[in-house]
Each structure stands twice: as structure tokens, then as C-alpha cells.
Amino acid sequence: MRARLILSSLLLASLAGCGGGSDFADLQSYMDEVRARPKGTIEPLPKFQPYEAFTYSAASLRSPFQPPVKIDLTVRQKGNKVIKPDETRVKQFLEGFNIETFEMVGTLSNAQGTFALVKGAGGVHRVRVGDYLGRNDGKVVGISEGKIDVIEIVPDGEGNWLERPRSLTLKERS
């Protein structure tokens, strides 16, 4: 019973705070004062220049990381119609890969001769003089302890063929 009395008195006291007193005159006067103040001006948005798309046009130029190649057309090596790849020859496995993917890793010598070990094309492969290496009909013509000499047959751009010497050198471990 006593709890009911306390609860009822608290309820009545809280309802008395919600009475109909409409004494908001000071709030209303402040709001009128704020509305009467002069309005500020907002600066207009700045004019933006339209975006111009950039097109990279140096893709066909020489890479800055490669040394410049001077081509003198008068001194340029001319191709020969006698030199041409043997189309009837059966291609070897290592001819299916670019020669740049191969790296010389060592040599082997036994009763059968000297072999070079090249790393690339998914493993380490053994090559000897007379084998072919790379996509340009590169024939191994010499093997020494430090390098493999290869002669490639490449087109000269005028319907003839050139023999281009290349070599794979043994990379020293550092």
C-alpha cells in the first residue's frame, strides 16, 4: 500500500512538470532576433577546368633502360638468299622457347664430349654442339667453360636471311 502511495505521488509530480505553462516568450524573442539578422553571402563555386585525358604516346619509342642502337642503313648487314633455315629438319624441344629465357649454369665433360647445362623451359637441360636452341633456328656451334656460342638465322626484313651470332655466358654466383 505504501508503495502505491509513493508511486502515485511521483507520477503526479512528473505530470505537474508537463503543465500548460506557455512561457516561451524569451525563446520566441531570441528566434525573432536571429531571423532578423542580415543574411551572409556564400561565395560562388570556383570554375574548374575540364579534365583532359592523357594518352601515353611513347610506347613505340626506345625504352630508356636500353642503350641506344645506332642503325646506319649504308653499313647495315645485308641478307643472303643462300642462308635460310632448314624447314625439313625436325624441331628440337628447346626451339619452342625464346633464347632469352635460357641461362647457362655449367658444363659437363665425359667420353661422349662436352655438354653445356642451360636453365630454362621448366628445368635444366643438356645441350651439345650441333643442337638447336631458341625460336630463331639457333644452332650451338661452340661450348667452352664460360659460354655457349650460338648462330641464329633471322630474317633481314627484305626477304633474305642473316646469320646472327649470340652467346650465353655463365653467370657467376655472388
Swiss-Prot record:
Top-level taxon of origin: Bacteria
Keyword presence, Cell inner membrane: yes
Annotated signal peptide: 1-17
Membrane topology: Lipid-anchor
Inactivation phenotype: Deletion mutants lack surface pili.
Cellular location(s): Cell inner membrane
Lipid moiety-binding region (S-diacylglycerol cysteine): 18
Gene3D superfamilies named among the record's database cross-references: 2.30.30.830
Cellular component, GO, one term: plasma membrane
Disulfide links within the chain: none
InterPro entries referenced in this protein's UniProt entry, alphabetically: PilP
Subunit structure: Interacts with PilO, PilN and PilM. Interacts (via C-terminus) with the outer membrane secretin PilQ.
Function field: Inner membrane component of the type IV (T4S) secretion system that plays a role in surface and host cell adhesion, colonization, biofilm maturation, virulence, and twitching, a form of surface-associated motility. PilN/PilO heterodimers form the foundation of the inner-membrane PilM/PilN/PilO/PilP complex which plays an essential role in the assembly of a functional T4 pilus. PilP connects PilO to the secretin PilQ. In turn, the PilM/PilN/PilO/PilP/PilQ complex facilitates transit of the pilus through the periplasm and clamps the pilus in the cell envelope.
Name under which the protein is recorded: Type IV pilus inner membrane component PilP
Upper lineage: Bacteria, Pseudomonadati, Pseudomonadota, Gammaproteobacteria, Pseudomonadales
Gene that this polypeptide is encoded by: pilP
